Amino acid sequence: MTGRYSRQELFAPIGPSGQKKLKEARAVIIGAGALGTASAEMLVRAGVGSVKIADRDYVEWSNLQRQQLYTEDDVKKEMPKAAAAERRLRSINSDVDVTGLVMDVTAENIFELIRDASIIVDAADNFETRLIVNDAAVKEGIPFLYGACVGSYGLTFTVVPGSTPCLHCLLDALPIGGATCDTAGIISPAVLQVAVFQVTDALKLLTGEECEPVLRSFDLWKNERSEVRAASLKHDACPSCGTKDFPFLSYENQTKAAVLCGRNTVQIRSSITKEADLEALAGQLRQAGLEVAANPYLISCRSDDMKMVLFRDGRALIHGTNDIARAKSIYHKWIG
């Protein structure tokens, strides 16, 4: 066998019939950073028929250490990640319908984005977006493959609506906020390990196999790994998959962002962060090399031409831009 997918078809759990199912499948990837590009490349090489990848950001020098689809030329041209990823993925496999979407994923546009999707792969850079996607996935009955990593640590769980707990059910078991890749760093093996778990489950689901409801976590540097059988964590009263209220699709539970008139500043009020631990956050930001000032009411930090002021109630001012998408990107890089 010398065909493009011959070695994959020789793998008995997939075979020629599974390969046909992959060709008919549609994957949507939320985020085109490290996780998104790794998962996208594997899915495209595997022959998944349609791959959409959505991201609001552009390629920077600090991305090249772990975001495998991008080049120095993309940085110099300030290419949007989704556009650069689309071009590269099309060059890898012209048989796949690849669409890169330069957009901020919100409750307002999520249903158009995931229309007709077979699976949704999480590669978002913040937890609020994940909860929006989780609610939409549960509502539409589309499997959602959660994944996150920072430092040498990673975490994955596959949500199968109607069968497994959803992400909302697992909130008490998941780390929300805190360290980010921009404050604690990241090594590429951790990214790839998470993507491996996500794409393996994606291939299983797309070829008709079931996935176990297992919450997987690991720390590669410490050579630690754990698995939690998560079926018992499903809550009948969960507002997302239980009572089907889908709270994160409502306006009241979304991050509010507004451009402040005449100030080149965006105000952001997170729906998740109710009260910030300013002291702990100041320490993280200083460790990341940012210039930080603090008083009992707020902290401020600078990086290049951008300044962020964070108040104890979780409200933030991003100075140096009037672009809401850019301000959100900076906020989630520094705050999580």
Swiss-Prot record:
Keywords assigned: ATP-binding, Metal-binding, Nucleotide-binding, Nucleotidyltransferase, Thiamine biosynthesis, Transferase, Zinc
GO molecular function, one term: ATP binding
Binding site for ATP: 7, 34, 55, 66, 81, 105, 125-129
Residues the record lists as binding Zn(2+): 166, 169, 238, 241
Signal peptide feature range: none
Highest taxon, organism lineage: Bacteria
Catalyzed reaction equations: [ThiS sulfur-carrier protein]-C-terminal Gly-Gly + ATP + H(+) = [ThiS sulfur-carrier protein]-C-terminal Gly-Gly-AMP + diphosphate
Cofactor(s) needed: Zn(2+)
Catalytic residue positions: 181 (glycyl persulfide ester intermediate)
Enzyme Commission code: 2.7.7.73
Pfam families on file: ThiF (PF00899)
GO cellular component, as recorded: cytoplasm; cytosol
Record pathway: Cofactor biosynthesis; thiamine diphosphate biosynthesis
Cofactor note: Binds 1 zinc ion per subunit.
GO BP annotations, alphabetical order: thiamine biosynthetic process; thiamine diphosphate biosynthetic process
Family label: Belongs to the HesA/MoeB/ThiF family.
Function text: Catalyzes the adenylation by ATP of the carboxyl group of the C-terminal glycine of sulfur carrier protein ThiS.
Matches recorded under PANTHER family: ADENYLYLTRANSFERASE AND SULFURTRANSFERASE MOCS3, UBIQUITIN-ACTIVATING ENZYME E1
Protein known as: Sulfur carrier protein ThiS adenylyltransferase
